[in-house]
UniProtKB/Swiss-Prot annotation:
Keywords: Cytoplasmic vesicle, Endoplasmic reticulum, ER-Golgi transport, Membrane, mRNA transport, Nuclear pore complex, Nucleus, Protein transport, Repeat, Translocation, Transport, WD repeat. WD repeats lie at residues 14-53, 59-100, 117-158, 163-222, 229-272, 287-326. The COPII coat is composed of at least 5 proteins: the SEC23/24 complex, the SEC13/31 complex, and the protein SAR1. Component of the nuclear pore complex (NPC). NPC constitutes the exclusive means of nucleocytoplasmic transport. NPCs allow the passive diffusion of ions and small molecules and the active, nuclear transport receptor-mediated bidirectional transport of macromolecules such as proteins, RNAs, ribonucleoparticles (RNPs), and ribosomal subunits across the nuclear envelope. Due to its 8-fold rotational symmetry, all subunits are present with 8 copies or multiples thereof. This is Protein transport protein SEC13. SMART domains: WD40 (SM00320). It is found in: Cytoplasmic vesicle, COPII-coated vesicle membrane; Endoplasmic reticulum membrane; Nucleus, Nuclear pore complex. It is a peripheral membrane protein. Pfam families: WD40 (PF00400). It comes from Cryptococcus neoformans var. neoformans serotype D (strain JEC21 / ATCC MYA-565). GO terms for cellular component: COPII vesicle coat; endoplasmic reticulum membrane; nuclear pore outer ring. Component of the coat protein complex II (COPII) which promotes the formation of transport vesicles from the endoplasmic reticulum (ER). The coat has two main functions, the physical deformation of the endoplasmic reticulum membrane into vesicles and the selection of cargo molecules. It also functions as a component of the nuclear pore complex (NPC). NPC components, collectively referred to as nucleoporins (NUPs), can play the role of both NPC structural components and of docking or interaction partners for transiently associated nuclear transport factors. GO terms for molecular function: structural molecule activity. PROSITE patterns: WD_REPEATS_2 (PS50082), WD_REPEATS_REGION (PS50294). Its main location: membrane.
Length: 332
């Protein structure tokens, strides 16, 4: 099966070093990029193209690895994480406004919060599904994960715990689903027994991915699953949205040149893992040409983008009874 991806549109970012991340906001009207040049740049996107001069945000003292937009219901807010071990929260406040504790106003953006509890590079950040509230999860080379819950009074509740002994490289939230009493269907339960579950997956330098859930009674994060399968560092992990789809899917990308799809058809079943096959299917070779750095799902959760160290991006879909198939690829 084949499919045509739209032609890539280049963006002249004016970054002075390697670009590590690029993220569109919820509406697709703004593009944020970050780089080893220690800056973040924000572009307006008009008809699919970045227009005008970017806003340049400075403050990190080392490479900026990732940026992440909050849901617009919380305002125009962007988080960034860096090799300097810090996480910044930026807010658009408009020219001539802003008086938070974070620092000076930069082109209408203000650094309103700074998270400094990690002792090594913060490699990945992710905002929770919006119905869980303004919650940011962070994964660090110090082996710990921190979860920042922003309160209405402006304070931050921080929960930090060890996740991967040799370093946490990536983090991704599960889609928001309602918790249910075991053995009772959702339709049979009173409405007050339902609450959105907090759950995410992490990837580590211990070659593992781990699934964590929040225990509402004990008010702490607990490990629910450990999934093996990779033979080297797991560079990225992505939990698929499940809009109209049965079951759950998690994709993981590794230094071992493989991508694994971990699936669970129902809450009562076990996780199973299967590799993508970038070579001819009959060869059954799961290895990409180089280390795989990023995986990202489409909004509907039915297409997976894979970014490889050879500079190519491939798009994958699950075929009917045929496993996962590459439907398009292009050079980045």
């Amino acid at each position: 099966m084949s499919a045509q991806a739209s032609k890539p549109v280049p963006v002249e970012t004016q970054h002075e070093d390697m670009i590590h991340d690029a993220q569109l906001d919820y509406y697709g009207k703004r593009l944020a990029t970050c780089s080893s040049d220690r800056t973040i740049r924000i572009f307006n996107v008009i008809k699919g193209e970045a227009k005008g001069e970017p806003v340049i945000l400075k403050g990190h003292t080392a490479a900026v690895w990732q940026v992440s937009w909050a849901h617009p219901s919380f305002g125009s807010i962007l988080a960034s994480c860096s090799y300097d071990g810090r996480v910044f929260i930026w807010k658009e406040v408009g020219q001539g406004q802003g008086k938070g504790s974070g620092g000076e106003l930069q082109d209408g953006w203000e650094r309103i919060k700074e998270h400094t509890l990690h002792t090594a590079s913060v490699n990945s950040i992710a905002w929770a599904p919006y119905d869980l509230g303004p919650i940011l999860a962070c994964a660090s080379s110090d082996g710990k994960v921190s979860v920042l819950s922003f309160q209405n009074d402006g304070s931050i509740e921080v929960n930090i715990f060890p996740a991967h002994g040799t370093g946490a490289n990536a983090i991704s939230w599960a889609p928001s689903v309602l918790s249910t009493v075991s053995g009772v269907s959702r339709s049979q339960q009173p409405s007050n027994s339902l609450a959105p579950q907090k759950r995410f997956v992490t990837a580590g330098s211990d070659n593992l991915i781990r699934i964590w859930g929040f225990d509402e009674e004990q008010k702490k994060w607990t490990e629910e699953e450990t999934i093996k399968g990779h033979e080297d560092w797991v560079r990225d992990v992505a939990w698929a949205p499940n809009i109209g789809l049965p079951g759950m899917y998690i994709a993981s990308a590794s230094q071992d040149r493989t991508v694994l799809i971990h699936s669970r058809p129902s809450p009562s079943s076990s996780w199973t893992s299967a590799p993508l096959l970038p070579s001819l299917p009959q060869s059954q070779d799961p290895h990409f040409p180089d280390a795989v750095w990023r995986v990202s799902w489409s909004l509907a959760g039915n297409v997976l983008a894979v970014s490889c160290g050879d500079g190519k991006v491939s798009l994958w879909k699950e075929g009917v009874g045929k496993g996962w198939e590459c439907v398009s690829d292009f050079s980045s």
